[in-house]
Amino acid sequence: MSVTLDLQLASASTDGLPSEAQLQGWLDGTILGFQQEAEVTVRIVDEAESNELNLTYRGKDKPTNVLSFPFEAPPGLELPLLGDLVICRQVVEREAAEQGKPLMAHWAHMVVHGSLHLLGYDHIEDDEAEEMETLERDIMQELGFADPYLNDEE
């Protein structure tokens, strides 16, 4: 059982970023509960790249915390490629500060949240959002972090 991490650092600054070992642990803690083998690219970017990707793929002209790009293999081709996560350093840092959350807890949450999208979970409909948020809470707790939605419910 393993998750292969391909880490790409495309941010001008690497100060305050999680270590490769932390990212690996968060991916393992999320994905191995669903499948035995996977390969995930995590690309940490600045706001300009996040904004460009968010506009191109979601039609939203602003940077966002995490974008998930699931890999869709052609029929009959079995590969462990799960997909790519693109995480914007500045947005994660800003959100953590605004929400009063520890920075590493918010990084972990973005990896968990994005990984669940790669696994096919979504939050467009209310029932889907509830299921996904429950999984996020459970996984974050297993990883040793507080409920990431606690402040949202106050």
UniProtKB/Swiss-Prot annotation:
Q: Where in the cell is it found?
A: Cytoplasm
* Needed co-factor(s): Zn(2+)
**What functional role does this protein have?**
Single strand-specific metallo-endoribonuclease involved in late-stage 70S ribosome quality control and in maturation of the 3' terminus of the 16S rRNA.
Protein's recorded name = Endoribonuclease YbeY
Q: PROSITE patterns this protein is in?
A: UPF0054
Q: Member of which family? A: Belongs to the endoribonuclease YbeY family.
UniProt KW keywords = Cytoplasm, Endonuclease, Hydrolase, Metal-binding, Nuclease, Ribosome biogenesis, rRNA processing, Zinc
Classification from the root reads: Bacteria, Pseudomonadati, Pseudomonadota, Gammaproteobacteria, Aeromonadales
Alphabetical list of HAMAP family matching this protein = Endoribonucl_YbeY
**Single biological process term from Gene Ontology:** rRNA processing
Pfam families in the record = YbeY
Q: Give a Gene Ontology cellular component term annotated to this protein.
A: cytoplasm
> Cofactor note, please?
Binds 1 zinc ion.
What Gene3D superfamilies does this protein map onto?
Metalloproteases ('zincins'), catalytic domain
Q: Which organism is it from?
A: Aeromonas hydrophila subsp. hydrophila (strain ATCC 7966 / DSM 30187 / BCRC 13018 / CCUG 14551 / JCM 1027 / KCTC 2358 / NCIMB 9240 / NCTC 8049)
Q: SUPFAM superfamilies, from UniProt?
A: Metalloproteases ('zincins'), catalytic domain
Q: Identify the EC number(s).
A: 3.1.-.-
